[in-house]
């Protein structure tokens, strides 16, 4: 949660192996999915409960008369179970995203992991689970870094690929330097045995690649 340009910003976490998946598999009630009988049903269940991170902003939170909550990145509809056995149908969420879909348009972004204000901008680091989700294109791998320039502007992508290392699946921390010369990113990287793998710190400066 970060305060920026007159608003409070926050994001959500939705890990792929979530409690929702476990509950839908084990529940025997008619409104639950139940145990998948085949790979097709397992895929339907996995897709039905999967969620990417949503991103929100609140204003005037202390005054219920003027309080404003905005969904910046999210969905106006999401799958719900189970109007018919082993099926998901779409249901309205009651929200309309101001700027775009969940995950900042990247389905693998499951978690808005960190944020920091630097040089008048709001920087946002994600946890991108794409590399753990099976075969995909390498272009989708690696944590995202996003930037918001003002309360009137959408997020702009700074990097899609783990700040140069696709095995960096998360930007775990962002910390501006006290002298204002840059911002330090602490990465999450599970590939500690890979050449060049493991935990990293990245120094980000204006104009640097």
Task: List each model region and its residues.
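Short catalytic/ligand-binding loop motif for oxyanion handling, primarily in non-cytosolic enzymes
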Residues: 17-21, 80-82, 131-134, 191-194
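Surface-exposed loop and turn segments in beta-propeller and other repeat-based domains
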Residues: 61-107, 153-166
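Blade-level signature of beta-propeller repeat domains, shared across WD40, Kelch, NHL, RCC1
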Residues: 118, 123, 171-208
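Residue-level signature of beta-propeller blades and closely related beta-rich strand-turn architectures
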Residues: 7, 14-16, 61, 128-130, ...
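Signature of short aromatic-glycine-proline-rich micro-motifs recurring in repeat-based ectodomains
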Residues: 1-3, 15, 42-53, 85-119, ...
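Ankyrin-repeat and related helical/solenoid repeat scaffolds used for protein-protein interactions
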Residues: 135-138, 142-183
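Extended non-catalytic domains of envelope/secretory-pathway proteins
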Residues: 7, 11-12, 24, 69-72, ...
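Beta-propeller blade signature
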Residues: 23-64, 136-152, 196-208
């Amino acid at each position: 949660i970060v305060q920026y340009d007159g608003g409070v910003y926050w994001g959500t976490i939705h890990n792929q192996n979530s409690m929702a998946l476990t509950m839908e598999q084990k529940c025997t009630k008619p409104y639950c999915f139940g145990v998948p009988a085949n790979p097709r049903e397992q895929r339907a269940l996995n897709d039905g409960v999967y969620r990417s991170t949503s991103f929100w902003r609140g204003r005037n939170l202390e005054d219920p008369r003027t309080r404003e909550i905005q969904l910046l990145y999210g969905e106006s509809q999401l799958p719900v179970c189970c109007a018919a056995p082993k099926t998901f149908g779409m249901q309205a969420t009651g929200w309309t995203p101001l700027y775009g879909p969940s995950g900042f348009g990247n389905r693998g972004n499951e978690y808005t992991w960190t944020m920091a204000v630097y040089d008048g901008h709001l920087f946002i680091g994600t946890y991108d689970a794409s590399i753990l989700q099976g075969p995909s294109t390498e272009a989708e791998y690696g944590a995202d870094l996003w930037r918001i320039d003002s309360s009137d502007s959408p997020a702009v992508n700074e990097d899609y690929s783990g700040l140069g290392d696709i095995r960096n699946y998360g930007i775990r921390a962002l910390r501006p330097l006290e002298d204002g010369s840059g911002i330090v990113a602490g990465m999450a990287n599970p590939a500690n045995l890979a050449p060049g793998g493991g935990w990293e710190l990245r120094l980000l400066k204006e104009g640097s690649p």
